[in-house]
A protein has these predicted regions:
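Beta-strand-rich, repetitive solenoid scaffolds
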Residues: 7-9, 38-40, 47-53, 60-64, ...
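Short, aromatic/His-centered strand-loop micro-motif at the edge of beta-sheets
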Residues: 62-86
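Short tryptophan-centered beta-strand motifs in secreted/extracellular beta-sheet-rich domains
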Residues: 23, 82-93, 104
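Extended recognition patches within non-cytosolic domains
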Residues: 1-5, 96-98, 103, 112-119, ...
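Short surface loop/edge beta-strand patches of beta-sandwich-type extracellular domains
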Residues: 1-18, 70-79, 141-143, 180-185
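Short hydrophobic/aromatic patches on beta-strands that form ligand-binding or substrate-lining surfaces
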Residues: 21-28, 87-89, 137, 151-155
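Extracellular glycan-interaction patches encoded by glycine-rich segments
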Residues: 125-151
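Extracellular glycan-recognition modules
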Residues: 3-62, 95-98, 162-165
Length: 190
């Protein structure tokens, strides 16, 4: 729905360096900035958004704190409004290699071609899992960009960076990426 959202503010701080976001999403509209999953408020924010500024209809993972600290935007364009997309963002800022600090999977495949690729510094503390920082699905507090579409099987994992195979698998007959409705994961504190 175009103007509904869920929000939760953690009462205790979890692991701000290592976490996983997994979500199945289906768009109703294309072409405008839409916030899918966020942490923070407008101006000090992070999360997943459909972005028109970095490549029309690109699903970007970002964090902005005065300037862009994280900006991972694949070249792949997501404009099919009849299709369910599965996105997994695995964050581990403790990694020595910058490109291992944020891994981006779309429909089971790790993305390797990016319009922008700004990785966080080593051991960076993100806005996610921070006590007192709002985590929101479908909106960003203080902003007007609601997500317009449907979402399913949203998982937020605190303390572990899982790859896409924890949340889905390829159908042996059709070759299509399919949902794992009961992922075997450890959710952590938040």
């Amino acid at each position: 729905m175009a103007n509904t959202y869920l929000t939760r503010t953690p009462s205790s701080t979890g692991n701000r360096k290592i976490f996983t976001i997994s979500a199945w999403i289906k768009r109703s509209k294309t072409g405008n900035n839409q916030k899918v999953i966020t942490a923070g408020t407008s101006g000090t924010e992070g999360g997943l958004q459909f972005s028109t500024g970095t490549g029309e209809n690109c699903l970007k993972f970002y964090e902005y704190v005065g300037s862009e600290v994280i900006g991972i935007a694949p070249n792949r364009i997501l404009r099919d409004t009849s299709f369910w997309y599965h996105v997994v963002i695995a964050v581990d800022t403790t990694q020595a290699t910058a490109s291992n600090r944020v891994k981006y999977y779309l429909n089971g495949v790790q993305e390797t071609s990016f319009a922008t690729a700004t990785y966080p510094s080593q051991n960076y503390d993100t806005l996610f899992n921070n006590s007192g920082t709002a985590n929101t699905i479908g909106f960003l507090i203080g902003h007007s960009a609601y997500f317009d579409g449907s979402m399913s099987h949203i998982n937020f994992i605190d303390g572990t960076a899982y790859d896409a195979s924890a949340f889905g698998s390829t159908d042996a007959t059709t070759g299509e990426w399919q949902i794992n409705t009961s992922p075997s994961v450890t959710y952590g504190t938040n």
